[in-house]
Amino acid sequence: MLPIQQLQELIQGKKVAFIGAGVSHKRCIEQFVELGAQVTLCDQKKSLDDFGDYADTLRRLKVNLSLGEHYTDGFAGQDIIMRTPGYEYYKPALQDALKAGAMVTSEVELFFEFCPCEIVAVTGSDGKTTTTTLISKMFEAAGRRVFLGGNIGAALLPQLADVTPDAVAVVELSSFQLISMRRSPKVAVVTNVTPNHLDHHKDMQEYIDAKRNILLWQVPPCRAVLGFENDITRGMEKDCKGEQVWFTRLHETDRGAFLRESDDMLCYAENGVVTPILPRKEIQLRGLHNVENLLAACAAVWGRVPIEAMRQVGSTFTGVEHRIEPVRTLDGVTYYNDSIASSPTRTIAGLRSFDQKIILIAGGYDKKIPYEPLAPEVLAHVKTLVLMGATGPRIEKAVRDCDGFADSGLTILHADNMQHAVELARGAAKPGDVVSLSPASASFDLYPNFEVRGRDYKNIVMNLK
């Protein structure tokens, strides 16, 4: 039986509720209706018209609706509930549905269940998207057909009919997706784990356990790629079911990818043999954290693609949007967009990628994560700090309380919004300076996501006269 037929067998004639109509669910709703499911859309929007252009599709598909304040009432009597990653797995309404006999799953979980090809998946607090993209491009350079999805690219489940056994699926997974997963990929990569999304998870341990899920359901033969520099990922070695390899920038390992100190060469060690991959000077990506991302990608694809494919991608790939992305140079000042930096560790990596003190725009939605680790890095790498958003006061307090603040010469400015922040940064900048949006915070106080935030910043910068 073909995978798409297996999916149809699962859902045909069943009552299926979708929580929300985000990008991935829109295509899945159409797919499920076509495969014979009785679909109900449960959404906080108050009326069908609130869905904009998609309202016409919902009407055409004759989708049932459970909208408004009591949208979770639509869970009652459902056979299957399709959870969106942003809807917490342990919310009472969802747990009640589970107890009532509903199957709670997601687009990614069903894809993992029915996918006929090898899956390579990446998780971590930082570096997921760049590492996932590097892996996909290495497979493409080797001539493989790649299906890219999860937190990046298009929804995978609606493409199930096109996936063949000789393809490869490369998937980025967040903790929100992993928390309920009971299947793992053939190759699992955990870049690092640091405090993040603590507004969503009940505590740090739940967040760590969600990340561990990428490993726990692996079936040999399989591979786990873990970051050696991170204490938490290093501790996950005990969770590995098959081959376990490291990636490390600061140490030399006998199994995995590392940066050789003697000649600054990215290498791979296996069975006592060390193979050079690429000199670090040829890497196009900015920042030492991206050396780690490239090492992780090489460890993931080792033995699956030729070394030349790794070299080609490593020496030509210039980055993903919103990740230390050059925007423009105006009056001798260079502006960068690092809107992806929604945590202190991500901002720290960005700061360390510059060889001068910069003007930093930071602040945003409060995810209840500590800012004390960011403070000394700000003092070391920032000349002017422009703060905005809900976390602005918390970042400022951490910086002012940090040893060395009084003698640092750091200037702190306060902005009401992004336009104001860019204007303040420009006013503080002199020829030769760097301005970077690297918020160390999520975007949700002012923007729906970091992409919209980054594009607004770029638009403002591009319109400076």
Residue map of PLM features:
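C-terminal helical cap/extension that packs against the catalytic core
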Residues: 55-59, 374-432
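Residue-level signal for inorganic ion chemistry
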Residues: 32, 81, 122, 151, ...
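N-terminal leader/targeting and accessory segments in enzymes
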Residues: 1-106, 110
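Beta-strand->loop->alpha-helix junctions that form or flank phosphate-binding loops
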Residues: 40, 68-69, 105-109, 241-260, ...
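Short internal beta-strands
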Residues: 38-46, 225-228, 361-362, 381-390
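Phosphate-binding loop of NTP-binding sites
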Residues: 72-76, 85-228, 232-242, 427, ...
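Nucleotide phosphate-binding/pyrophosphate-handling subdomain across enzymes
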Residues: 3-15, 25-35, 145, 279-383
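Short beta-strand "acidic-cap" motif of Rossmann-like dinucleotide-binding folds
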Residues: 39-43, 148, 170, 246, ...
